[in-house]
């Protein structure tokens, strides 16, 4: 039993060590304040994302409004043009947030960023936003990434 407890603690600490806070650009968080953005694994920036893999994204933010729902939209910005970047779950209420969202409460939004095999090797800026039920942004952040083979 003691071994299982030690093993569990080791795994939990290892997983938390993989979550890398990244430097991000706020691109218009109108009704929220971003506290931290983590991409795992991303030990250096720009994040090097490998085709065929999926990356964990965790955003800690404080809401400045109430909302019954939330929706995530992700784009890759290539030469100034936003290109939709599909994610597994666009419903923020199914991504670590318990809805309804309350004013002045801090939330942890969690999702995956899958990098498809057919994506080209390219440098791109990822823009990730989460909106409320009035289409106002709880958060919007951007980070540079490099898609690699």
From Swiss-Prot:
Q: Mind telling me which Pfam families this protein's record contains? A: E1_DerP2_DerF2
**Alphabetical list of Gene3D superfamilies matching this protein:** 2.60.40.770
Q: Which InterPro entries match?
A: Ig_E-set, ML_dom, ML_Npc2-like, NPC2-like
SMART domains from the UniProt entry = ML (SM00737)
UniProt GO MF annotations: cholesterol binding
Q: Where in the cell is it found?
A: Secreted; Endoplasmic reticulum; Lysosome
Would you say which domain of life the source belongs to? Eukaryota
Q: Where is the signal peptide?
A: 1-19
Provide the glycosylation site positions: 58
Catalytic activities = cholesterol(in) = cholesterol(out)
Is-annotated flag, keyword Cytoplasm?
no
Tissue expression, as annotated, is: Expressed in kidney, spleen, liver and mammary gland, but not in testis.
Q: Which GO terms describe its biological process?
A: cholesterol efflux; cholesterol metabolic process; cholesterol transport; intracellular cholesterol transport
The UniProt comment on domains reads:
Binds cholesterol in a hydrophobic pocket; there are no hydrogen bonds between the sterol and the protein.
Q: Which family does it belong to?
A: Belongs to the NPC2 family.
This protein's name? NPC intracellular cholesterol transporter 2
Organism listed in the record:
Bos taurus
């Amino acid at each position: 039993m003691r071994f299982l407890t030690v093993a569990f603690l080791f795994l939990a600490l290892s997983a938390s060590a993989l979550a890398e806070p990244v430097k991000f650009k706020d691109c218009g968080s109108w009704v929220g304040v971003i506290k931290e953005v983590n991409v795992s694994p991303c030990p250096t920036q720009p994040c090097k994302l490998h085709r065929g893999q999926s990356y964990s994204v965790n955003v800690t933010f404080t809401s400045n409004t109430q909302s019954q729902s939330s929706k995530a939209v992700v784009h890759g910005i290539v030469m100034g043009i936003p290109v939709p970047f599909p994610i597994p779950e666009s419903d923020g209420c199914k991504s670590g947030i318990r809805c309804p969202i309350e004013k002045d409460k801090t939330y942890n939004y969690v999702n995956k960023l899958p990098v498809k095999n057919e994506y080209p090797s390219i440098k791109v800026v990822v823009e990730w936003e989460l909106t409320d039920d009035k289409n106002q942004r709880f958060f919007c952040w951007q980070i540079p990434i490099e898609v690699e083979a």
